[in-house]
Amino acid sequence: MSFASTSPSPWLAAVLAIAGAAALAPAHAHQVWLENAGGQARLHFGEFNENLREASPGRLDQFKGVPALEQRTGTAAQRVEGQLGKDGFHYTVAGTPDTLFAAASYPLIDRSKRNLPALYWQPSARWVSGLTQAVAPTAPLDLVPTGKPGEFKVVFKGAPLPKAKVQLAAPSGWTREAETAEDGTVGFATPWKGQYVAEVKHSDKTPGEAQGEKYGEASYVTTLTFVLADGMASPDLPAPPKAH
């Protein structure tokens, strides 16, 4: 597979304006992502690259309860319960996990006014301690590091997902997009130090049932958060959007 250019200049050309469109976007246009530092993990809801974090009271309350966090260290897995905070779901993490994962539960989305079946929206988030170690996928739609520099893999229901569009947001919020190869892998240059958040989306038109209700289509969005200690100093994230 071919990797994205190692030159940071394409990133600089990809600066996104943070217009008020984010405030008008439906909830399922958002993402959830994990941050972890000092034994305290946070699951945020919004848009990392726009520095938008939904709050409680507010759109954060639309989820069906507090998602459980799965903590994995080596082959050991542990379930961690959390609490709803003002800016996200909060968790206390023990030790030094290799990866954290959370899948949030959102009510089925009624699309009957458009003569469409109900939509099952599944936002999920993964955090990894580094990119040098491969992580096994566990979610229906998962995005994991392969252990090779700058390489990631997208898996859907246990199989590599080719031609999936993966967006990587740098610590500044600047984004690049690349498509997975036939084996589900994709590569990015990561020239800056700091926190990155990658995202992949996938739609499945297979009908199913969730939360005791039937749906006609499923929409998955999964993020992967990692922090790099080495690299160039990065500009800051943009100022948060005005309250909405």
How should these model regions be labeled?
Residues G39-L52, V144-F156:
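Beta-strand-rich structural segments
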Residues S2-V15:
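Bacterial N-terminal signal peptides that target proteins for export
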Residues G85-Y91, T180-G194:
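Glycine-centered loop-to-beta-strand initiation motif
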Residues N49-H90:
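N-terminal, post-signal-peptide region of Sec/Tat-exported proteins
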Residues L24-P26:
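N-terminal signal peptide c-region/cleavage motif recognized by signal peptidases
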